[in-house]
Amino acid sequence: MHLTYLGHSCFLVETGSARILIDPFLTGNPTAAMKAEDIRCDTILVSHGHEDHTGDAVAIAKRNDALIVANYELAEYFAAKGARTHGLNPGGAHAFPFGKVKLTLAHHSSSVEAGLNAVYLGSPCGILLQAGGKTLYHAGDTALFLDMQLIGRANLDAALLPIGDNYTMGPEDALVALDFLKPRLAVPMHYNTWPLIAQDGPAFARRANEAGHTVLPLKPGEKLEI
């Protein structure tokens, strides 16, 4: 399994012949490592309804004939815009040709803007992806919560965790999350996109590594093998 960080909370996962895009916010993202029109994928996983996660999902899905997997209400929203979708709910899993996707809890909100109103579209979620003999956890946007210990029972090869604070957990809580999840490797995300979520990724990694974890902050465009 290869993982490419595309900025904010967006990642491209390559496993076997599958190309899986997670939380595709590229257009309007000052840290984006690629343009939306250059993305090639066959599946898109979306954690929740906020624009900095749904971003280019429909446009990329239509261009690539890719399947969008998201919570049920969000999947229906994407389907109404002409995308192919598969809806899940937290705790539910489904086997796809590339592997299994399970949605987990996340403590956050999940809305899309509709003029002056926010329309809520189901529960925010984390994503467990099992493919190619590896297990990846994308936490989505979330606060720290005790049930992360249950997610850790999935024997995680990698965890992608927000550290930006303000809208999600910050570095202090992310360190506790690492204790709960016990991944072999963690990558911080959802930080330094805007001043309000500015954090020192290398400093977070040093503290985590000193505590016995393996954390690798990636720059947008960097790739690693899990």
Label for each model-derived stretch:
Residues 1, 14-20, 93-102, 130-136, ...:
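Beta-strand-turn-beta hairpins that frame and shape the catalytic cleft
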Residues 1-19, 26-29, 102, 203-211, ...:
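Zn-dependent metallo-beta-lactamase
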Residues 12-50, 55-62, 73, 109-120, ...:
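Pre-active-site segment of Zn-dependent metallo-hydrolases
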Residues 21-24, 41-49, 69-72, 137-140, ...:
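Active-site neighborhood of phospho(di)ester-bond hydrolases with catalytic His/Asp-centered motifs
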Residues 29, 50-55, 75-78, 92-95, ...:
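Active-site environment of divalent metal-dependent phosphoester hydrolases
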Residues 55-113, 118:
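Glycine/small-residue-rich loop that forms an oxyanion/phosphate-binding "nest" at active or ligand-binding sites
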Residues 67, 79-93, 175, 179-226:
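Binuclear metal-ion centers of metallo-dependent hydrolases, dominated by the metallo-beta-lactamase
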Residues 113-179:
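Active-site-proximal loop/helix segments of hydrolase catalytic cores
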